[in-house]
Amino acid sequence: MKEQLEQLQVEALEEIKQASTQKSLNDVRIKYLGKKGPMTEVLRGMGKLSAEERPIIGELANTVRTAIQSTLDARIEEVKAIELEEKLKAETLDVTLPGRTSTPGHSHLLQQIIDEMEDLFVGLGYTIAEGPEVETDLYNFEMLNLPKDHPARDMQDSFYITEETLLRTHTSPVQARTMLEANGKPIRIICPGKVYRRDEDDATHSHQFMQIEGLVVDESISMADLKGTLEVFVKQLFGETREIRLRPSFFPFTEPSVEVDISCFKCGGKGCNVCKGTGWIEILGGGMVHPHVLEMAGYDSSKVSGFAFGIGVERMAMLKHGVDDIRHFYTNDLRFIEQF
């Protein structure tokens, strides 16, 4: 048994020396010192030894076990140090290499257009007014000359929450609220914000989009003031060479009402495939505030008048930057967003 123990020590120490990973060293430990290992078998067989042999073999077994364990511990520390050094070498940073610059964030194209239009109108003396996106039927329709039985309500398929509350279909409710709060005083505001309609999403329609509506109420306001304001707006946003024209239209909250066209960007008014041969592209709607709307808001329509207009933000962005699908604004595709 003495020779067996000495042979075990030689074999174990040699395997420890050859092991190069913590896993292989753990395998050596289990092989020689585990519950089913040869050292355990030797110790179990000591009961068969004579009284004279037992202390000698027991002392030798403990010496061999201690030698194997201490050699294992020392080798594990060596391997740990080697593995750490290799890891550090692999993760070493070359400080002479140029650093990676992070991509700076920027405003979304729609926000850029909104900021540009807001700055433009603020420069013309307008203030910015805002209101809730969840509106009452009163402000979204009735205060804008759209009573419950008005056929024009069918033109705006709405998201109703209850019978009397809905997601606003335009930012005009902000105008109604502002007029009521003004107590008959002059107003010059723009109202930017999200609006919602039950449209099928396609290249030119979205169930959610953004508007900027404008409202001016004062004495002696005329259609000429509306036309002059929109001419300034178009020339500053799209360039001095752009012209506008007004066409008769119908909106319940304005009378008279107009559609506003801009001279074609591609052909300059001569006629092409973009403008469908007309030389003009429709961009927004507006008109003189209906006397009923003024009266419901507390104004004397015999003394004051006003004009209003509504601008689709996505429409402006598509025209100015040549975007052909409104859905690009909301898909969060960086390939599109990073172009602007």
Swiss-Prot record:
Pfam families: Phe_tRNA-synt_N, tRNA-synt_2d. The keyword Electron transport does not apply. Its cofactor is Mg(2+). It comes from the Bacteria. InterPro entries: aa-tRNA-synth_II, aa-tRNA-synth_II/BPL/LPL, Phe-tRNA-synth_IIc_asu, Phe-tRNA_ligase_II_N, Phe_tRNA_ligase_alpha1_bac, Phenylalanyl-tRNA_Synthase, tRNA-bd_arm. Its main location: cytoplasm. This is Phenylalanine--tRNA ligase alpha subunit. It comes from Exiguobacterium sp. (strain ATCC BAA-1283 / AT1b).
